[in-house]
A protein has these predicted regions:
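GIY-YIG nuclease catalytic motif and its immediate N-terminal context
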Residues: 1-113
C-alpha cells in the first residue's frame, strides 16, 4: 500500500500557497528564500517571542498557520527548507505530538522593507 503524501492534502496546498504569497508580497524585487525562516511549533505566540528574544528584534512579516497535524506541518517545513528557507541545525526542537503550526518570517529584511 502506498503511503499518503501530506503535501497533497487540501490543507497543505492552501498553506503552501499562502506562504508563497506571504514571501512574494514581502520580498524586494525578487524572492530570496534564504532571507526567510520556516519552523513548526505547538505555540506560535510563544515561539514568536522566542525568536524576538534570540534576535533582539521583532520577527519581520511573521505569519503562522494551523496545519492540523504534525505530519503535514513537517512536510510543509521540509518543502520550504528544500527551497532554501532557513532552519535551525537542531531538528527535534519541536513537540512531536503537538507541533501542528507552521510559521515563517523574514529573518533578513532589506533596507527597502
Amino acid at each position: 500500500m502506498k503511503k499518503d503524501n501530506p503535501l497533497k492534502t487540501k490543507t497543505a496546498k492552501k498553506i503552501i500557497k499562502e506562504i508563497e504569497l506571504q514571501v512574494s508580497e514581502n520580498s524586494t524585487l525578487y524572492v530570496e528564500y534564504s532571507n526567510w525562516y520556516c519552523g513548526i511549533t505547538n505555540k506560535p505566540n510563544v515561539r514568536k517571542s522566542g525568536h524576538k528574544s534570540k534576535n533582539n528584534k521583532e520577527p519581520a512579516f511573521w505569519k503562522s498557520f494551523n496545519a492540523r497535524s504534525v505530519k503535514i506541518s513537517l512536510s510543509i517545513e521540509t518543502h520550504f527548507h528544500n527551497k532554501g528557507m532557513l532552519d535551525t541545525d537542531d531538528k527535534g526542537g519541536y513537540d512531536k505530538d503537538k507541533s501542528k503550526f507552521i510559521y515563517v518570517y523574514k529573518k533578513h529584511p532589506t533596507i527597502l522593507d
